């Protein structure tokens, strides 16, 4: 009787290509040294990426690490819940609820235009006083372990869509912050408020930003947006928002930096805090990565 390890290595690799990554990494890699070495072979992860459509042969973009590329692609999705108002205001924290409060309406809405993606059916709309809502994304809870984020620091792509009513002016604002485990702000994107004049074309506009080469230690992402109308009309005449997204890209930092020393006093979401209060990074990279890979 032939033992499985007596099979040619190319046959074993072919078998591994068809095994789901969580089982491959959590279980198969621990069987023996031969399996561990084969599972770490670059060609295995390149072929798995091709097989699952993460990469095509005619794609010219270079890949630094095929194993990490595959893992990031398998995790990739919108980390914001209920981005298109399909569940009313569920999953959103209401930070400001001025005027007649937040409301959900169906596209295109009064004095509005259709959305570029016809799969999007609804939007959130603000009123005559400030309306703000937010979500705090816990990266560890979403499958992005500390070792993955700190060692490779994949790009974080943030997008939002906003539109005014044609008959009323309004202002829109967006704030995105990358924070540590104890909510120290490590990087932020907060562009100046956008003002739309009355009698505009009411077209939907995309606001986007990519965080690259940010400091290690990112554990949370705060996403907050909203606004109000500029004419103080009763009802819902402020900016409309929908299809918001936070996506962790497969693109990673080329030269991960050493651990960063925080300044004496640092910005914390909602307050200020001494650097000595922050937690230290823990964990062995590969063990943590294998154990935390999403099913």
From Swiss-Prot:
Q: Its Gene Ontology molecular function terms?
A: carbohydrate binding
Q: Which residues are modified to Phosphothreonine?
A: 280
The positions making up the signal sequence are none
Could you tell me which SMART domains the record lists for this protein?
A: FBA (SM01198), FBOX (SM00256)
Residues in F-box domain copies: 1-48
Among the entry's GO cellular component annotations, what is one?
Answer: SCF ubiquitin ligase complex
Q: In which tissues is it expressed?
A: Present in liver and kidney (at protein level). Widely expressed.
Q: Name one GO biological process term.
A: ERAD pathway
Phosphoserine modification sites?
249, 276
Residues annotated as domain FBA: 69-250
Enumerate the subcellular locations listed in this protein's record, separating them with semicolons: Cytoplasm
What's in the keyword line of the UniProt record? Cytoplasm, DNA damage, DNA repair, Phosphoprotein, Ubl conjugation pathway, Unfolded protein response
Subunit relationships: Interacts with CHEK1 and CUL1. Part of a SCF (SKP1-cullin-F-box) protein ligase complex. Interacts with VCP.
Q: What does this protein do?
A: Substrate-recognition component of some SCF (SKP1-CUL1-F-box protein)-type E3 ubiquitin ligase complexes. Involved in DNA damage response by specifically recognizing activated CHEK1 (phosphorylated on 'Ser-345'), promoting its ubiquitination and degradation. Ubiquitination of CHEK1 is required to ensure that activated CHEK1 does not accumulate as cells progress through S phase, or when replication forks encounter transient impediments during normal DNA replication.
Q: Know the name of this protein?
A: F-box only protein 6
Gene for this chain: Fbxo6
């Amino acid at each position: 009787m032939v033992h499985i390890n007596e099979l040619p290595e190319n046959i074993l690799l072919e078998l591994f290509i068809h095994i789901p990554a969580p089982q491959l990494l959590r279980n198969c890699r621990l069987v023996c040294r031969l399996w561990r070495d084969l599972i770490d072979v670059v060609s295995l992860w390149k072929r798995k990426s091709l097989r699952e459509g993460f990469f095509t042969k005619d794609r010219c973009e270079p890949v630094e690490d095929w194993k990490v590329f595959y893992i990031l692609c398998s995790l990739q999705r919108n980390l914001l819940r209920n981005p298109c108002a399909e569940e009313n205001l569920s999953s959103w924290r209401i930070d400001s609820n001025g005027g007649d409060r937040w409301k959900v309406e169906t596209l295109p809405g009064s004095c509005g235009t259709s959305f570029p993606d016809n799969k999007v059916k609804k939007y959130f709309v603000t009123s005559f006083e400030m309306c703000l809502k937010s979500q705090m994304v816990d990266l560890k809870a979403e499958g992005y372990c500390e070792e993955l984020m700190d060692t490779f620091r994949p790009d974080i792509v943030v997008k939002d869509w906003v539109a005014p009513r044609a008959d009323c002016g309004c202002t829109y604002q967006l704030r995105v912050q990358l924070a540590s485990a104890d909510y120290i702000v490590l990087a932020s994107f907060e562009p100046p408020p956008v003002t739309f004049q009355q009698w505009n074309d009411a077209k939907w506009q995309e606001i986007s930003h990519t965080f690259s080469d940010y400091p290690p230690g990112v554990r949370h992402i705060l996403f907050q947006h909203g606004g109000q109308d500029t004419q103080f009309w009763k009802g819902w005449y402020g900016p409309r928002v929908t299809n918001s997204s936070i996506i962790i890209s497969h693109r990673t930092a080329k030269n991960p930096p050493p651990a960063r020393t925080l300044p004496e006093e640092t910005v914390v979401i909602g307050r200020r805090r001494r650097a000595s209060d922050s937690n230290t990074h823990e964990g062995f990279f590969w063990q943590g990565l294998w154990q935390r890979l999403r099913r």
